[in-house]
Amino acid sequence: MTNNLDKLKIGNKSFNSRLMLGTGKYRTTQSAIASIEDSNCDIVTVAIRRLPVNLKNDNINFLNKLDWNKLWLLPNTAGSQTAEEAIRMAFLGHELACQVGQEDNFFVKLEVISDPKYLLPDPIGTLKAAEFLIRKGFTVLPYINADPMLALHLEDLGCATVMPLASPIGSGQGLNNLANIKIIIENASVPVIIDAGIGTPSEATQAMELGADGVLLNTAVAQSKNPSQMASAMRLGVQAGRLAYLAGRMEKKYYADASSPLEQISKLI
């Protein structure tokens, strides 16, 4: 287990879990709820465009079945093709947070994606929307390409995190942008959350071993054969990677180094 003092701090909030879970693509509502529970995540992200205007009038929506005293809602602006659309979505997201009893929740996962084929985030639109939302008091978590300079610009604007993609969203290709992600982690003064492209627990572990502060997953869990079980596996993968990062990797050596040196044995004789 990680140290209780080793919390993920985003804005003015602290979280025990470094795994965030999305809510799309699940085969059933029950599967989504079970996966969230088994992941032990603290943050759940929800696409605003998929939700009704008023949750109180929707007894079917699974968000009404989650315990929002234990979970923190992260509305996301998925589907926004322009900065203006993302800004509107962000304000709707705050209204949703209020409906689940989180009036002080101004978090938003900012996604501006104008490319319908490859679903790569729009850096210009993201910068524009982030600047406006920060001025309005939002805690902005921007989804970006693994671009070290863009990450720095967003941090300078006041973003609470940066969220570089590991590989294209929903692809399960893993950490394809390893070199740039390392640079982002090295340069960042805000938490770095790896978002999109991770397909296995070992890839989540690798991301955390690099020094990432957290991982956000959706498709890898929702589209697995057993989402609840995969959610548990991802939880353990993130925990293992974080522990390994804190413990510190052994130094790589060119030559072999015996684990039972002869000089130590001679002292016992």
Swiss-Prot record:
This enzyme's EC code(s): 2.8.1.10
InterPro entries cross-referenced by the UniProt entry: Aldolase_TIM, Thiazole_synthase_ThiG, ThiG
GO molecular function, one term: thiazole synthase activity
Keyword Manganese: no
Residues engaged in binding 1-deoxy-D-xylulose 5-phosphate: G170, A196, G197, N218, T219
Entry superkingdom: Eukaryota
Description of how the protein assembles with itself and partners: Homotetramer. Forms heterodimers with either ThiH or ThiS.
Protein name: Thiazole synthase
Species whose genome carries this gene: Phaeodactylum tricornutum (strain CCAP 1055/1)
